[in-house]
């Protein structure tokens, strides 16, 4: 047993999709979450800058005595996962390989679609991972950066959201896929709009689910599961605290939430 919290980070509110799955699948675990809204978006930054920000957040989480770090951000996973794993004395889990594995479990032939930020798409993170896991599987990757802002600004469920999503996903009308990876943790909050745009026969893959399953497996293997009957969720924003509070109220399950601000700078 290990009652220390799980640390979770994202560039903004998207990581709450991972926290929500932790609430569902690991209900006795406490969480410390950092949404780096002060530096949002990561998806338009270069990899070196994202790496430094992620390392700073890792150091912040380590000071709060987390037992594990979940990088609930595809852009940060692509840019910083090996650096975080080398720098921190705790397990660090990203979202890209779990997402790729989940997609391949559903569709071994492809083509597999991927929607992600500009940075994740430019890095080629999903095609490279899928190629490593299942050589020769075709992948159609599309940068859909405007969809990230829709979620971050609380516009899910609106006509504006559907308009933006439908426009961004036109590629998959021309190049149909059976499986679509939501390769940004913001995108599960747009699942209804995405499904409407690509059609009900396309399976949507949320990497959060497989990522949390990976975390749970590690905790079980190392006898490190928590046993909090009523866990606390400590959520920090480096920017807009009211937006974080709105996201918590809209997307997370009920629980005891402590919200606050954190100062994160490159090289902290």
Curated annotation (Swiss-Prot):
How changing residue 73 to A affects the protein?
Abolishes racemase activity
Q: Which PANTHER family does the record cross-reference, listed alphabetically? A: GLUTAMATE RACEMASE (PTHR21198:SF2)
Protein purpose: Provides the (R)-glutamate required for cell wall biosynthesis.
Q: Know the name of this protein? A: Glutamate racemase
Gene of origin?
Answer: murI
InterPro entries linked: Asp/Glu/hydantoin_racemase, Asp/Glu_race, Asp/Glu_racemase_AS_1, Asp/Glu_racemase_AS_2, Glu_race
Q: How does it assemble?
A: Monomer.
Q: Which residues bind substrate?
A: 10-11, 42-43, 74-75, 185-186
